[in-house]
Amino acid sequence: MSGGLEILKLTEGDITKMLSANTHLGAENTNFQMEQYIYKRRSDGINIFNLRKTWEKLLLAARAIAAVEHAAEIFVISSRPFGQRAVLKFAAHTGATPIAGRFTPGAFTNQIQAAFREPRLLVVTDPAEDKQPITEASYVNIPVIAFCNTDSPLRYVDIAIPCNTKSAHSIGLMWWLLAREVLRLRGSIPRDGKWDVVVDLFFYRDPEEVEKEDQAAKEAAAAVPTPKQEPLEYGVTGASEWTEAITEQGGIQPSWADESLPGQPTVFPASNIDEWNTTAQPAAAVKPSEEWNAGRSGNWGTSATGNW
């Protein structure tokens, strides 16, 4: 569906990605409806897809997806573990509704159950594995897009994208290419630019391998030695030196700290003692009065009113 346009043709970079992910390798068995997409057969019995036809059907599927007004009405389904992560990533970038895992029977036909949905378009990973949603879609006239291998059944499939559905990398790459073309047709990303989302995010990852990688990362982090911090010393260095220097000068100069501490004698320099007047007599001590009201006036209550 490139229409002979140079901008829609398959690029060398996309061909390299497909060959690296073994997208061109099919199965040994062949469905008669898939023979038109086969380029040749190898000596070991493996069928090889024509990647140009794969690209043309991918563009057709992207145009059908981009034509749907509300992206949430597009359902992407994968019951196989290899395609569940790719389906979730595709839905996150395009706004489609993902169904990763087991499909609930009757979700498209039984209006009584809570999981009932009415999609406008259905995209499945493998027609052989996702047979139930394809069959229900045929009952309610929902168009179906499917990634098909050489031996995949094409019954009720409207747009078949020929590719290798047995490889986890091939499934992830095809979902990545489909998401990129949909975003290009919508105008979300430029066609002549590079999409900043790497294809590795669409690949399947074994949970055991992920757990092993996390464990190895924790062990590596624990093996890194923690720098030891030396205790801080709060002692004042050189205290004896400045104490001896002040003693040689004849005393300590008064400061505001001496006034704030009551009862602490103030030490003045020895050079200033000779200048003081030593002839002054101390003041006479005042003997306290024995009468408790001696200092008060005689009529101390006259300030109040008479009848209080």
Swiss-Prot record:
Residues 283-308 are annotated as: Disordered. It holds the Pfam family 40S_SA_C. Its main location: cytoplasm. The keyword Cytoplasm applies. SUPFAM superfamilies: Ribosomal protein S2. One of its GO terms (molecular function) is structural constituent of ribosome. Disulfide bonds: none annotated. It is found in: Cytoplasm. Keywords: Cytoplasm, Ribonucleoprotein, Ribosomal protein. Residues 299-308 have a biased composition (Polar residues). InterPro entries: Ribosomal_uS2, Ribosomal_uS2_C, Ribosomal_uS2_CS, Ribosomal_uS2_euk, Ribosomal_uS2_euk/arc, Ribosomal_uS2_flav_dom_sf. GO terms for cellular component: cytosolic small ribosomal subunit. One of its GO terms (biological process) is ribosomal small subunit assembly. Component of the small ribosomal subunit. Mature ribosomes consist of a small (40S) and a large (60S) subunit. The 40S subunit contains about 33 different proteins and 1 molecule of RNA (18S). The 60S subunit contains about 49 different proteins and 3 molecules of RNA (28S, 5.8S and 5S). Interacts with ribosomal protein S21. Belongs to the universal ribosomal protein uS2 family. Required for the assembly and/or stability of the 40S ribosomal subunit. Required for the processing of the 20S rRNA-precursor to mature 18S rRNA in a late step of the maturation of 40S ribosomal subunits. This is Small ribosomal subunit protein uS2.
